[in-house]
């Protein structure tokens, strides 16, 4: 009986077949297009210009660190917000000028934040130009050997 009828929130009864047909407008199952665990990664179309990130050689180290702290917390993608903000809270204060420049290039030189996430989690191989000391440090941070909960960004 339960499988045949579903009581809607307004108290109206609707046959299960009607619900399953109206569930998707096209009546196609989404599994026809992707498989579980598949990475959907398309190349950027050639007509989409990605602006070059401006190099800031005269920026003071303290100003650069403050900017990177902000940019690490505000990626627009929760996964990277959590990974990068906790990474920066732990390591940025100890970075020298060269390491800070490497980190700047890593988070701002890549046009797609998903690339950073996939590289850091070893889902995709890291390209040689981004396989630096900082990326290796980030990969170790992502492994979370200390089993620290990272469900929110650290306080400022």
Curated annotation (Swiss-Prot):
Boundaries of the annotated transit peptide in chain numbering: 1-24
Subcellular localization(s) per the UniProt record: Mitochondrion matrix
Cellular-component GO terms for this entry: mitochondrial matrix; mitochondrion
Keyword Nucleotide-binding: no
Main location: mitochondrion
Function: Plays an essential role in the assembly of succinate dehydrogenase (SDH), an enzyme complex (also referred to as respiratory complex II) that is a component of both the tricarboxylic acid (TCA) cycle and the mitochondrial electron transport chain, and which couples the oxidation of succinate to fumarate with the reduction of ubiquinone (coenzyme Q) to ubiquinol. Required for flavinylation (covalent attachment of FAD) of the flavoprotein subunit of the SDH catalytic dimer.
Recorded family membership: Belongs to the SDHAF2 family.
Protein name (Swiss-Prot/TrEMBL): Succinate dehydrogenase assembly factor 2-B, mitochondrial
Organism per entry: Drosophila erecta
């Amino acid at each position: 009986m339960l499988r045949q009828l579903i009581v809607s929130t307004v108290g109206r009864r609707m046959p299960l077949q009607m619900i399953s047909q109206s569930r998707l407008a096209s009546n196609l199952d989404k599994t026809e297009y992707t498989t579980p665990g598949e990475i959907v990664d398309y190349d950027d179309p050639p007509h989409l210009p990605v602006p070059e990130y401006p190099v800031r050689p005269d920026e003071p180290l303290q100003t650069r660190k403050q900017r990177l702290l902000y940019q690490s917390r505000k990626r627009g993608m929760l996964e990277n917000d959590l990974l990068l903000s906790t990474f920066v809270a732990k390591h940025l204060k100890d970075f020298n000028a060269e390491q800070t420049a490497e980190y700047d290039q890593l988070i701002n030189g890549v046009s797609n934040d998903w690339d950073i996430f996939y590289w850091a989690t070893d889902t995709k191989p890291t390209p040689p130009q981004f396989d630096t000391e900082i990326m290796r440090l980030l990969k170790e941070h992502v492994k979370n050997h200390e089993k620290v909960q990272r469900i929110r960004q650290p306080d400022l």
